[in-house]
Amino acid sequence: YLLDALCKIGRIDLAYTLLWQSKKPSWLYEVDAGGTTMWENCNGYDDDGNPGNLSFNHYAFGAVADWIFRTVGGIDTKAAGFKHLRIAPKPDGKIRSSSRSYRTEQGTVVCEWNITKSEKKNIFSLHTVVPCNTVATIELPDGTVHDVGSGEYRYEVEISL
């Protein structure tokens, strides 16, 4: 939960730096080293390329996938059963678009966004679907917040990266 902790103290920039880091210890080191599962720790191989004494199929660092879904993908919950959603993607500039959906008992939640450049401005566009019998708090990267009910919503705001 390191990435969540960094976000809670206002250091989303540091969370993204850690996410993108490919030196060990990091998540991308595992990918660059050929990993297709989560390892028990981030230092799976020593400097000579020999595997350490650990599990190469272990969820110890799996919280990164959840963080990506909630922070990059923008879909989170504010109440049990996804009856009150939090739609709050937090782009870092390296990722220019995301499309996520999640099936709940009330229906499918959709959060799709992209960043385009227009006249030297970065325009963040969001499309989201809030299922029936559900409410959502939509938090845009420019700081504006919208409390909405079921429906389909589109927003465009200028952001700095």
Question: Where in the sequence are the language-model features?
Answer:
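Conserved small-residue packing positions in alpha-helical repeats and bundles
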Residues: 2-3
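Non-catalytic C-terminal accessory modules of carbohydrate-active enzymes
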Residues: 13-161
